[in-house]
Amino acid sequence: MQDKLIIRGARAHNLKNIDVEIPRDKLIVMTGLSGSGKSSLAFDTIYAEGQRRYVESLSAYARQFLGNMDKPDVDSIDGLSPAISIDQKTTSKNPRSTVGTVTEINDYLRLLYARVGIPYCKNGHGAITASSVEQIVDQVLILPERTRMQILAPVVRRKKGQHKAVFDRIQKDGYVRVRIDGDIMDVAEVPELSKNKMHNIEVVVDRLVQKDGIRGRLFDSIEAALHLGDGYVIIDTMDDHELIFSEHYSCPVCGFTVPELEPRLFSFNAPFGSCPTCDGLGIKLEVDLDLVIPDENKTLREGTLAPWNPISSNYYPQLLEQAMNAFGVDMDKPWKDLSDEDKKLVLHGSGDTAFHFHYQNDFGGVRDIDIPFEGIISNISRRYHETNSDFTRNVMRSYMNELPCATCHGYRLNDQALSVRVGGKEGLNIGQVSELSIADHLSLLTHLELSENEKTIATPIVKEIKDRLTFLNNVGLNYLTLSRSAGTLSGGESQRIRLATQIGSNLSGVLYILDEPSIGLHQRDNDRLISSLKKMRDLGNTLIVVEHDEDTMMAADWLVDVGPGAGALGGEIVASGTPRQVAKNKKSITGQYLSGKKKIPVPLDRRKGSGRFIEIKGAAENNLQNINVKFPLGKFIAVTGVSGSGKSTLVNSILKKVIAQKLNRNSEKPGKYKSISGIEHIDRLIDIDQSPIGRTPRSNPATYTGVFDDIRDLFAQTNEAKIRGYKKGRFSFNVKGGRCEACSGDGIIKIEMHFLPDVYVPCEVCHGTRYNSETLEVHYKDKNIAEILNMTVNDAAEFFAPIPKIARKIRTIKDVGLGYVTLGQPATTLSGGEAQRMKLASELHKRSTGKSFYILDEPTTGLHTDDIARLLKVLERFVDDGNTVLVIEHNLDVIKTADHIIDLGPEGGVGGGQVIATGTPEQVAEMTESYTGQYLKGRLNEK
């Protein structure tokens, strides 16, 4: 087999017909500036060709179900193995997909509970066991010699009635004696029973004395009793001691029954095991009392019930007042002071009790009717489910939230599945185990108490579970729970979960391609991730990792630096060799950072800020432990901490949502907190995330930043446009007039090929320009509108330099390091990091008030160290204008430049949620209990 992967003539996107040779069975890191062509080489060339070759080996029938498999623009690739891509874009948004299902740990857990689990009565009557006739006989024969016993078959258990038909059947079957409510009597002499009382009726099947030779008779009698008693038998030893057995998993006291234990019982995705109320989702859309009653200090008359405020109609205020008067509820007493009974009436209604309602509308219409009072919760729920109006449904939805299911308490399973425990009476059910962190789950399995027989069955299953949990632990995900919904995971988390699954598969000879697996990972956990990558390599696999992390680059066997610049300035192999060889390469920007010749400097001094704060008290959402946090304004703030320590919960779930509620009247409910102060010191909240700037190819940098409006104005003012009577709209590709109607302004035509991938070809009429020929005849400085859109930002900045209004907006795109993109580049082709910087550019050209609050969650995702240096200059411009910038970040180059650090921890999950350190980077670096401080110290010493 070849020992090299040889790529010849790669031209995908901006790649410039490159040739590169990469060693097989090694850990290879591909790096370079954002937009340099790393992903084009790794994913769009190497992985795409690996996938295409596999799919081509399938039948035409199978290929039609596998989607598009375009042949990448490359001359040849030799030495290619089957390829598996683990990127950040394929996170499942299915609410049924959890960490447990994605990693397949749930499959093994279900098997474990089906094989060694013991059901316990949900009503507290102890363990429920199922016994065969043979097992029951064996247990009875253990009784002491000469023990007198009678074998009873329970035919009626705690049921009202006279049960005459039961006695008739007993007599027909030839039985003589029965026990009724504890008293033995002949069937023929049974008195008439009270039909309003609960009764227990047992048939006396046999009477025996314990001695040698009774096994055969005992077996027959117990078998007959089980048949008569619907699977139950009672052994009465005549000394007030009874043994109750069942051949089903059924509680002998209350009758709670569990079906035969099999894996499907423990699946929330199967009707057999899922909770019947929430269908296995664990959540239900319910009316949220906090949204219905936002202020408990208000009275009913003052409008404490938000949905029934008299904004558009006086119907509900009239209904409420007349109902409250009828039922004697004080309309002028604050909600918090009303009795529980009065609150219940307001919320849930009066049941069947009616009151007289007289209603007159604004047009004079009168309604007199006796009706029950519905209650506001029932009213919202009914209107949400019954209305045909989208507007009404959306209004009602704004008072509802996805809350844990009241039946299964969020565990997703039915009572029968949740009654089964592993590890004895004090053991946990499968729902409780799924709520444990990975670290706690590992500890539980290590100390699991099982009988010798159970150990024999469970050992191979437990090994598989522990192996997978250990892999998750080793890639820094020890804080996650198996019940965590896959849709709530970050890109880095979901990628590392799939990475752990691949390690568990123990495949060899595979080509793995990973996209920044270190995203969201604290420096402390990075070593474990690198060890996991090396373990995959040592199994005989080739790993190509697109990465910017310095530690990962230095741990690689081979480093490929793509560049030298981004976009049209990139697409070449600048350096290819060992990390040490690349570090010595003077042409490589990556090499200069690795060797220390280039670095992001530590600021000489820190900003003092405005002296004002936003302070949150009592933050207690998720794992936050009732903490108080101050965010100083007018500073560059970094919120840090190990993965899972509570950073995103504090910033995204509480701070951001509370500010949005107060400033923007956002209805999204924030996480738990007691109070917040200082919001009056800011006037804008800007959340700059990595979501796309547009969902369609029609959105592009020019339209997003607004510069396209100015460019169209400019074209409309040209002499040619005035002569022809063209207005600004003529130069839009979104509306009829100036656009090409053959492709509706898209510039491309989609051709469906059925068994082959859909093909996109340039429009034959406009040749991809998007405009009709008449529009393209209008020129500004010898360029038509299509040629302007095809310009890179760098070229456009020079071209429009004499026009300040346009030049200023284009310069901001250049300032954030996106000079290589074209003005008309479709938004769908921009990476997350590029989209985030485009949003920053859009903010840069707006006039600053000096009171804005910017939030960025891991802005360094996808950025090279050189890109980070540019990003920091942009963020510093915001702060220098008096604004506040808050970043959630693990990158030490960003953290060391911050004015103020808030470090959470000490660990992830339940071991986190505390404020470990606050202050300048220098102050945090001196705090030994801070993991961030320990790593920061080394970076600060590089001054």
Swiss-Prot record:
Pfam families: ABC_tran (PF00005), UvrA_DNA-bind (PF17755), UvrA_inter (PF17760)
Binding positions (ATP): 32-39, 641-648
Gene Ontology CC terms, in alphabetical order: cytoplasm; excinuclease repair complex
Subcellular locations according to the entry: Cytoplasm
Keyword flag Chaperone: no
UniProt keyword annotation of Manganese present: no
InterPro entries, alphabetized: AAA+_ATPase (IPR003593), ABC_transporter-like_ATP-bd (IPR003439), ABC_transporter-like_CS (IPR017871), ATP_grasp_subdomain_1 (IPR013815), P-loop_NTPase (IPR027417), UvrA (IPR004602), UvrA_DNA-bd (IPR041552), UvrA_inter (IPR041102)
Residue ranges occupied by any ABC transporter domain in the UniProt entry: 308-589, 609-937
Family designation: Belongs to the ABC transporter superfamily. UvrA family.
Annotated function: The UvrABC repair system catalyzes the recognition and processing of DNA lesions. UvrA is an ATPase and a DNA-binding protein. A damage recognition complex composed of 2 UvrA and 2 UvrB subunits scans DNA for abnormalities. When the presence of a lesion has been verified by UvrB, the UvrA molecules dissociate.
Subunit annotation: Forms a heterotetramer with UvrB during the search for lesions.
Matches recorded under NCBIfam families: PRK00349.1, uvra
Name by which UniProt lists this protein: UvrABC system protein A
Organism field: Streptococcus mutans serotype c (strain ATCC 700610 / UA159)
